[in-house]
């Protein structure tokens, strides 16, 4: 079996023409550019706004966490200081330095006819103490026991002694 190829006898040096290039889709090109431009125009501000919002949220979170931490420590120290300051009683020596007097007769200067610690009335000749800062009056034995445990007035919770900087605790008022 043999194959024959027809030959016309001419030799041509020109290459056969290449197929034409495919036509570019010029109708969709402006729409694509416009679409990409609008996406960039919208997405960049949205991304920047979201980034700023996240940073602001984190900043507020850290600020309030730090503020809460400081307040909690401050309240804890204040509570501990107050508990130490008011719950610790006075020394017997300090209590003995408080003003005392013998009860003679009912008077408005004593504030009442009863000692609020023992809920008993004042009697003629009993020793009493008048607290210097608030002026409340109690039986001497009652208030002495109270002040050894707690350094404040049993009625108004005012401190019996005032702390002055650079000095030790000292009673206020005169000592009788």
From Swiss-Prot:
Listed SUPFAM superfamilies: RING/U-box
One Gene Ontology MF term: transferase activity
Catalytic reaction equation(s): S-ubiquitinyl-[E2 ubiquitin-conjugating enzyme]-L-cysteine + [acceptor protein]-L-lysine = [E2 ubiquitin-conjugating enzyme]-L-cysteine + N(6)-ubiquitinyl-[acceptor protein]-L-lysine
TM regions (residue ranges): 37-57
Cell location: Membrane
Region described as Disordered: spans on this chain: 1-26
Keyword field contains Transmembrane helix: yes
EC numbers, comma separated: 2.3.2.27
Membrane association type: Single-pass membrane protein
Biological or metabolic pathway of the protein: Protein modification; protein ubiquitination
Positions of RING-type zinc fingers: 115-157
Enzyme class: transferase
Keywords, ordered alphabetically: Membrane, Metal-binding, Transferase, Transmembrane, Transmembrane helix, Ubl conjugation pathway, Zinc, Zinc-finger
Keyword Zinc-finger: yes
GO cellular component: membrane
Domain comment, as recorded: The RING-type zinc finger domain mediates binding to an E2 ubiquitin-conjugating enzyme.
Family: Belongs to the RING-type zinc finger family. ATL subfamily.
Protein name stated in the entry: RING-H2 finger protein ATL14
Organism: Arabidopsis thaliana (Mouse-ear cress)
